[in-house]
Amino acid sequence: MAMSDLPNDLVEEIISRVPVKSIRAVSSTCKNWNTLSNDHSFTRKLFGKTITTKENECLVVMMMDSKVYLMSVNLHRIHKENDDNNIKSSIMHKAKLISLNDDDILNNTYIIFHCNGLLLLLGFTDDGIKLVVTNPHLGQTRWIKPRKANYQFCDKYAIGYEKKKNNSLRTNKMLLFHKESFCFRIYWFEIYNFNSASWNVFYFTRDWELPYSQGVSLKGNTYWFAREINIRGERIDDPPDFLICFDFTTERFGPRLHLPFHSHSDDTVILSSVREEQLAVLIKRFDLWRMEIWVTTKIEPKEVSWNKLFLAVDMIPLITAFQFCNVSFFIDEKKNVVVVLGKDVLNTRNIANIIGNDGYFKQVDLGESTNKYCYPLVCSYVPSSVQIKQATRVMHHHHIVLRAVVRAVRDSDRERKLNNGREHKISRRTRIHERILFRMLKLDEEAIGIRSRSVPRDRYQQGFASSPCRA
């Protein structure tokens, strides 16, 4: 019997016994096996088994005091226990999430973003912003060099992927959306393509703002809570609110998506994902001290529908124990439980509030906060086999092409010298070479800094002065 003729159940059993780092190599031996290993429902089931072996346990990525951890949370046990020590043991550190050679970003991480098993970590150091993408389950990381050094903390960051006709082929991308505008409603955002290791800049107009930094990734796209602003970017009284989606396939923002409620400027609205399949939104009413959580039944870049109210809680008993200005949360639909992370009113302790729709409430002290300005962040974590494409091969090919063009221009210079100073007519071919070199060196100035090493700056500037061709 040929490998391709084996039943799917047997193939799944075989692949599930293969070490994680060897799955791709094994799958490449057979087309059917490769198709199965790239099926996202199978990989989600496979990697879910490898990490979460205990029943009723869920995995989350949690950032506390600028450090990132993988946590296991047993909400079923929490709901049953009354003893504080047993409840605290139900929220366990699995491990420090990643180990990098440069500890700066681990000790100064301020933003985490999860998409399809990949994590985007962002940190600010004395040397500027640092970006790293990691698949903690495969132990793969990739540092990304920012296009500019003067990014701001208020900028929005996200990671997603471009969808192909073949669902197993995806191009991972990162979005950097700048808050500042240079002329009324004209804004700009940058997209980093993992395959080409390049940045693209886009300008657009908008009539909305994103009051909160943290978005949520679902099915490769990113969603934010947004409010309307006027034509000059100024806030208006009681503005309409809605969701806005960035589609990584079209590289455009979509239309407004309606919410099941209307919020005011003093209300708190936070987004979260449910197994990276549905969107959950939390609203805490400022004047009523009431918290509501809604969950979508369907969500796409241009369409959304909502389920009935998932949870509604009177927050008055929590006024003196918890602050809602900067919180994050995740839910368990099966247990009808929500976990809300934040700080106490003095900003000295990290707190987790476990709330059930049957009136259950329990507060867990996660320890002293060493950074009063860094609020806990949490997002559900779904391990995956997504490989992080490294930039080395792309850059190596780029160097080869660049060296070839540099050689062509130097040959042209040598030809000019042989004319003993007499005027020499530049050939069409030489002009093309110089034009290509100009463009590539300009690109490398920010990408890999090869311009100054390939051609001295004076030759770089003078070499094209005689050429009528403009880049």
Swiss-Prot record:
Cellular component aspect of the GO annotation: plasmodesma
Listed NCBIfam families: F_box_assoc_1
Lineage: superkingdom: Eukaryota
InterPro entries from the UniProt entry: F-box-assoc_dom_typ1, F-box-assoc_interact_dom, F-box-like_dom_sf, F-box_dom, SCF_F-box_component
Domain F-box: from-to ranges: 1-46
Origin species: Arabidopsis thaliana (Mouse-ear cress)
Listed name of the protein: Putative F-box protein At5g36200
Database matches in Gene3D superfamilies: 1.20.1280.50
